[in-house]
Curated annotation (Swiss-Prot):
Gene Ontology BP annotations: double-strand break repair via homologous recombination; response to ionizing radiation
Protein name (Swiss-Prot/TrEMBL): Single-stranded DNA binding protein Ssb
Effect of I30A: Slight decrease in ssDNA binding
UniProt DNA-binding region: 19-88
Localization: Cytoplasm; Chromosome
Feature: compositional bias, Polar residues: 103-116
Function, as annotated: Binds to ssDNA, binds approximately 5 nucleotides per monomer, binding may be slightly cooperative. Inhibits the endonuclease activity of XPF. Stimulates reverse gyrase from S.shibatae strain B12 (rgy).
Pfam families assigned: Ssb-like_OB
Length: 148
């Protein structure tokens, strides 16, 4: 099922959206608890609002301002009271048709906000990061959505 940006909430998994890229940064490397990772950031939106998108790994730097893209299997987090969308190794991003899609100037400025209890400065807990194998051992996903 496809979501609208205005309906995004923290800790959603398997998120599918079609959005226009309003701003896009170049890829850069950052240090995380799992080592050096490549990311880029973008502001994307639809007729219901706009959201910050963090592109991890192979997706970093892959989208350009003005494009309309379909994003499949993304996830959301909360940071400083705002919902953020994330695209990792299991996410698919493809260019989509612009037919009938709002122009950048028609996309509202509003952004989805996190509930009051999730307004900390750190990365929101995704809840789905834990995976249990046949032996009951816990496996954790990193920022790119890959199991460790």
């Amino acid at each position: 099922m496809e979501e609208k940006v205005g309906n995004l909430k923290p800790n959603m998994e398997s998120v599918n959206v079609t959005v226009r890229v309003l701003e896009a940064s170049e890829a850069r490397q950052i240090q995380t608890k799992n080592g050096v990772r490549t990311i880029s950031e973008a502001i994307v939106g639809d007729e219901t609002g706009r959201v910050k998108l963090t592109l991890w790994g192979k997706h970093a730097g892959s989208i350009k301002e003005g494009q309309v893209v379909k994003i499949e299997n993304a996830w959301t987090t909360a940071f400083k009271g705002q919902v953020q969308l994330n695209a990792g190794s299991k996410t698919k991003i493809a260019e989509a048709s612009e037919d009938g899609f709002p122009e950048s100037s028609q996309i509202p400025e509003n952004t989805p906000t996190a509930p009051q209890q999730m307004r900390g400065g750190g990365r929101g807990f995704r809840g789905g990061g834990r995976r249990y194998g046949r032996r009951g051992g816990r496996r954790q996903e990193n920022e790119e959505g890959e199991e460790e």
